[in-house]
Amino acid sequence: MTAPRTLYDKIFDDHLVDRQDDGTCLLYIDRHLVHEVTSPQAFEGLRMAGRAVRHPEKTLAVVDHNVPTSPDRKFGIKNEESRIQVEALAKNAVDFGIEYYNEADRRQGIVHIVGPEQGFTLPGMTIVCGDSHTSTHGAFGALAHGIGTSEVEHVLATQTLIQRKAKNMLVQVDGKLPDGVTAKDIILAIIGEIGTAGGTGHVIEYAGEAIRSLSMEGRMTVCNMSIEGGARAGMIAPDETTYAYIKDRPRAPKGAAWEMARAYWETLHTDEGAHFDRVVKLDAANLPPIVTWGSSPEDVVSVTGYVPNADEIQDETKRLSKKRALEYMGLTAGTKITDIALDRVFIGSCTNGRIEDLRAAAKIAEGRKVHPRINAMIVPGSGLVKAQAEAEGLDKIFIEAGFDWREPGCSMCLAMNDDRLKPGERCASTSNRNFEGRQGFKGRTHLVSPAMAAAAAIAGHFVDIREWK
């Protein structure tokens, strides 16, 4: 009888090709997602070595990081470096026989939104991409994580990846989420609890009543930010919610293949008594809407709280780090979070650019107007999300309220396209990183949920969404 295994153990074992005496492992990779930023050198390496892509049918290429999101993007990309990267991906996709969604394809969008939409992401799979937020796909009970450019080339050439097995970590979130508290607040609370290095060397499995109650889109939000907690990957065991989301997707199994796949998926759960190297527990009932105040995702505080006093931190290194964060963010200790005035609001990204996120924001925006000082933008995560939102009339709600309705792409999550903050601008953002300069040189980022961002756009400052009338 085999020892009890975790979900991570099972998927890792099922894909193990070889294990060396020193613990180095070779894993088979089921799915490889590719975008324009981390792939050019990888494809050039294949070309120079005279190699083909081993399994083009297991590879999907999408442009997302560099593409403009303005309505006039059909006229081309102005930035030369961005244009070259996008053109290179188009050429490489043709040369190597890979399916490719360009900016004119309605299926185009952020790679981590497109994969699940197409049924390319399935439970029990190993999934990689040259992007740290590949952990998003772990919401389906997949082992998904980012890889570097040299590893991108290795996977393209061999459909395998050299790895060492990570440790197991369980994050148990029990209880019922209060009204106004979302999946984004769950993951920000987790990162606030464990810190940005808390998951280092581990794969996190998220479990508990609050996690099970989330939709697939909420689960993707949680898994998306596993890397911000330092983890190699994050995952949630599949269940009926998972199967309902996947069924009838374009790339999902059909007929008898579906039944066979589902039978396997139902084995993908952690066995009773399986060992976790670390266990963290949170009570969802006690979670508030959360806002980040500093320049790290671990710098979290309740919307009803105050900017902390760095001088009260005992550890000298951490104290100096938080003092720098306060200086960079232009904040004074003791300031009420709801007194922080904003300049910009960004709703989108692979964390919160899905249809449920837009619905949540539209519910707040309907019948209201964006504050005169605020420049607010809504960027759907894919062309299909945009089409669905427009079919539901969400675009009209946003436009009438004064939001800018954009085309799909990574947009202001990172300063690699035309959407970026100016120095000193302060933004409420539904993205995943608030590092210095992440959204633009000297830009100041506060991470929040879509509903919190929409309310901030209207009020001009942060508000407690639980008291929103």
Curated annotation (Swiss-Prot):
GO terms for molecular function: 3-isopropylmalate dehydratase activity; 4 iron, 4 sulfur cluster binding; metal ion binding. GO terms for biological process: L-leucine biosynthetic process. InterPro entries: 3-IsopropMal_deHydase_lsu, Acnase/IPM_dHydase_lsu_aba_1/3, Acoase/IPM_deHydtase_lsu_aba, Aconitase_4Fe-4S_BS, Aconitase_4Fe-4S_dom, IPM_dehydratase_rel_enz, IPMI_cat. The keyword Metal-binding applies. It holds the Pfam family Aconitase. Its EC number is 4.2.1.33. It catalyses: (2R,3S)-3-isopropylmalate = (2S)-2-isopropylmalate. Binds 1 [4Fe-4S] cluster per subunit. Keywords: 4Fe-4S, Amino-acid biosynthesis, Branched-chain amino acid biosynthesis, Iron, Iron-sulfur, Leucine biosynthesis, Lyase, Metal-binding. PANTHER family: 3-ISOPROPYLMALATE DEHYDRATASE (PTHR43822:SF9), HOMOACONITASE, MITOCHONDRIAL-RELATED (PTHR43822). Belongs to the aconitase/IPM isomerase family. LeuC type 1 subfamily. Heterodimer of LeuC and LeuD. Catalyzes the isomerization between 2-isopropylmalate and 3-isopropylmalate, via the formation of 2-isopropylmaleate. This is 3-isopropylmalate dehydratase large subunit. It comes from Chelativorans sp. (strain BNC1). The gene is leuC.
